[in-house]
Amino acid sequence: MNNDKAGKNLTKEAPRSPKTRVGNYVVLGRTYDKCRALLWGDIGEYHFDCPLDNMLFGFKGVKGDDFKAEVEKGASDTEMAQWLDTHGEKKTPEEVKAWSDEMMAANPYENPEKRDWFVEQVSVYNLDPKTTTLFDWLDVDDKESCAMASA
């Protein structure tokens, strides 16, 4: 375990991109950064255990509180990937890769229940909702939010 119990200041820098894979899991690095910021930094406008985090937790069948408790022990992001591998629903490396690939391609525009919300979100940045993935939008939103915070 890592004894470095410090979190990012998410009012000054964004968590990792949801595209960043840790142990082949997309979203994990971002979820980890937000959890550490909640525990030992400044989470700012971000939220831990949010719908995006819950996509990861739901895929593995774990709870946000259990994830947080493990991070609180000082687990590194690599150790958290190993923890996910051994907790919740057993998933093969192929299943993790397939889920991560599916998440990378996810576009809320394709979901009639989320379409209007997504169109509104991406229009702020003049992005095409039909071709912009959820992760692409989050990356742009993070970059713009951090630029505004440092201005």
Question: Where on the chain are the PLM-derived regions?
Answer:
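Polar/charged low-complexity regulatory segments
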Residues: 2-43, 103, 107-151
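Alpha-helix boundary/N-cap detector
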Residues: 19-26, 30, 47, 51, ...
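Generic structural signal for well-ordered, non-membrane alpha-helices
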Residues: 33, 62-65, 94
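Amphipathic alpha-helical packing elements
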Residues: 42-84
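Amphipathic protein-protein interaction modules
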Residues: 67, 71-125
